Design a protein with these regions (language model features):
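C-terminal transmembrane helix and the adjacent membrane-cytosol boundary/short C-terminal tail
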Residues: 5, 15, 23, 27, ...
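N-terminal signal-anchor/first transmembrane alpha helix
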Residues: 23-67, 134, 144, 148-150
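Transmembrane-helix boundary motif in ABC transporter permease subunits
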Residues: 27, 31-35, 118-151, 224-226, ...
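Membrane-interfacial helix termini and adjacent extracytoplasmic/periplasmic loops
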Residues: 29-33, 80, 84-85, 162-203, ...
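Interhelical loop and adjacent transmembrane-helix boundary motif
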Residues: 34-40, 83, 97-100, 104, ...
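Cytoplasmic-entry segments and transmembrane alpha-helices of multi-pass inner-membrane transporters
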Residues: 43-44, 131-165, 226-227, 240-241, ...
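Transmembrane alpha-helices
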Residues: 46-47, 148, 152, 204, ...
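Short membrane-interfacial helix/loop motifs at transmembrane-helix boundaries
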Residues: 56-104, 172, 275, 328
Length: 328
């Protein structure tokens, strides 16, 4: 009887031990998971880490070169740290940044770049908003086809697309030939090697960057708000300015930044379509780097441009945080 009574006790103690070990293992995993990033954090953090590394490291290198002096050698700039007689000396040159503020050419170039980028952004908005609105209000099947047409230019090399505009805009190109044949003009329009050609090239190249964020906001808009406005007697223009436009405000800001920021430093379009008097900061940086071999001056121009572009980005970030705070 003692043997039969003691027989069930072994499985019970073994099961209890396994249960205790399982709880302990889950407890250790739960404690460890507190220090590990979640799946969402990893999905968002890895691309940000990638961009930070491949943006921050080159920027730090350019920033370092901007404080050096130009020399004829490889590399064509001096070292910032020198050791003489066991003493470390730092040779930081601020003359390049001072020259940016004193030279009229650089100031005019920055202002011209900002103006051309701003005008191109406004033109992209005026053209892209009706396009995005029409696509968002189309049938789903047609909507997919239209968005595919918007993204279709990205399947072709950017350089080839800009080169194609040379054949369209030059004096004996397709556009002037068509306008003269229709009797609209009698002499060719000077579009190639001019600021007008640069505007056309930038609007064409950056228009999809305006359309896509606008479409993303317009397609999610609640159409019952417009129906309620019409039921209350609002005219279409009033409903658009009071409902549609405010609800698409974030799309306008995002699209404008996606166009404005790369347009400021654009080099290929003004180099191929612009004239000799077309002042863009990208062309100045190229000349300083490769023609003058003045890497410190070119780096200072680059750093100043990046700092200049941080202002609208910081304002946009502040606005987004404020919007989220008001929503809560």
């Amino acid at each position: 009887m003692r043997t039969s009574a003691s027989t069930p006790s072994a499985p019970v103690s073994t099961g209890a031990a396994r249960t205790g070990a399982g709880h302990a293992s889950r407890g250790r995993f739960a404690a460890l998971s507190r220090f590990l990033p979640s799946g969402r954090s990893v999905a968002i953090g890895v691309p940000f880490l990638w961009l930070a590394v491949f943006f921050a490291l080159p920027f730090v290198l350019v920033l370092k070169i901007s404080f050096a002096d130009q020399v004829m050698g490889i590399p064509p700039y001096t070292s910032l740290v020198e050791i003489k007689d066991g003493v470390v000396h730092f040779a930081l040159q601020m003359s390049h940044y001072a020259f940016l503020l004193q030279d009229d050419l650089y100031i005019a170039t920055y202002l011209s770049s900002l103006k051309m980028a701003a005008v191109s952004t406004v033109l992209c908005l005026l053209i892209g908003y009706p396009m995005a609105y029409y696509i968002a209000r189309s049938e789903p099947n047609r909507r997919n086809v239209l968005m595919m047409a918007v993204m279709l230019p990205f399947w072709t090399s950017f350089l080839i697309r800009v080169y194609a505009w040379i054949g369209i805009l030059k004096d004996d190109g397709l556009l002037n030939h068509t306008l003269i044949a229709l009797g609209i003009i009698h002499t060719p329009l000077r579009l190639y090697h001019s600021d007008a050609g640069v505007y056309i090239g930038m609007v064409y190249s950056y228009l999809p960057f305006m359309v896509m964020p606008l479409y993303a906001h317009l397609v999610k808009m609640d159409l019952t708000l417009l129906e309620a406005a019409y039921d209350l007697g609002a005219k279409p223009w009033v409903a658009f300015t009071r409902i549609t436009l405010p609800l698409s405000k974030n799309g306008i800001i995002a699209g404008s930044l996606l166009v404005f920021i790369p347009a400021v430093g654009e080099y290929v379009i003004p180099e191929l379509l612009g004239g000799a008097d077309t002042l863009m900061i990208g062309r100045v940086m190229w000349d300083e780097f490769f023609n003058n071999m003045d890497w410190p001056m070119a780096s200072a121009v680059t750093v100043a441009m990046v700092l200049l572009l941080l202002v609208p980005m910081a304002l946009f970030q502040y606005y987004q945080v404020k919007e989220l705070g008001d929503a809560k």
